[in-house]
Amino acid sequence: MSTEQKAQNPMRELRIQKLVLNICVGESGDRLTRAAKVLEQLSGQTPVYSKARYTVRTFGIRRNEKISVHVTVRGPKAEEILERGLKVKEYELRKRNFSETGNFGFGISEHIDLGIKYDPGIGIYGMDFYCCMTRPGERVSRRRRAKSRVGATHRITRDDTVKWFKSRFDAIVR
């Protein structure tokens, strides 16, 4: 074992738990409905509307008014959409895009860069990508019966995700 490299523990492998796509329009109505169509075209799933938590008079937002849409994508579809989003960013993110718990996010300014055909009836929308990472065995902290904590050595850190991101996508982190 000393001459050959030690085998990696399969329980330590990082994987994508979910990818959340969010478009915040800042107002309810027709623009929000068109943004929902964009997310439905991209993900193939029905998006969910999010409400404002409190009134902001300067922006003209009232409490409980629907102001954004988001969709959660899991599995191979999440990896494929993330790949398309990173291609727009040219596989380059900043160190501050990665959280302390190992998740990362970024935004794009035009959805047509993802390969969706431009429709004048819909318009152009920017969107946020947020990717949550996980390891096998993390269910122990979420399950209902015999719940326990994930140990400190098994928790995902920013450095773990940056290393995974660089190797998986051959990307640059500034």
UniProtKB/Swiss-Prot annotation:
Main location, first listed in the record: cytoplasm
Keyword tags: Cytoplasm, Ribonucleoprotein, Ribosomal protein, RNA-binding, rRNA-binding
Cellular localization per UniProt: Cytoplasm
SUPFAM superfamilies: RL5-like
Top-rank taxon: Eukaryota
Gene Ontology terms for molecular function: RNA binding; rRNA binding; structural constituent of ribosome
Cellular component terms per the entry's GO annotation: cytosolic large ribosomal subunit
Entry keyword Ribonucleoprotein: yes
A single GO BP: translation
Disulfide bond sites: none
Annotated function: Component of the ribosome, a large ribonucleoprotein complex responsible for the synthesis of proteins in the cell. The small ribosomal subunit (SSU) binds messenger RNAs (mRNAs) and translates the encoded message by selecting cognate aminoacyl-transfer RNA (tRNA) molecules. The large subunit (LSU) contains the ribosomal catalytic site termed the peptidyl transferase center (PTC), which catalyzes the formation of peptide bonds, thereby polymerizing the amino acids delivered by tRNAs into a polypeptide chain.
NCBIfam families: PRK04219.1
PANTHER family, sorted: 60S RIBOSOMAL PROTEIN L11-RELATED
Assembly information from the UniProt record: Component of the large ribosomal subunit (LSU). Mature N.crassa ribosomes consist of a small (40S) and a large (60S) subunit. The 40S small subunit contains 1 molecule of ribosomal RNA (18S rRNA) and at least 32 different proteins. The large 60S subunit contains 3 rRNA molecules (26S, 5.8S and 5S rRNA) and at least 42 different proteins.
Family assignment from sequence similarity: Belongs to the universal ribosomal protein uL5 family.
Protein name (record): Large ribosomal subunit protein uL5
Organism: Neurospora crassa (strain ATCC 24698 / 74-OR23-1A / CBS 708.71 / DSM 1257 / FGSC 987)
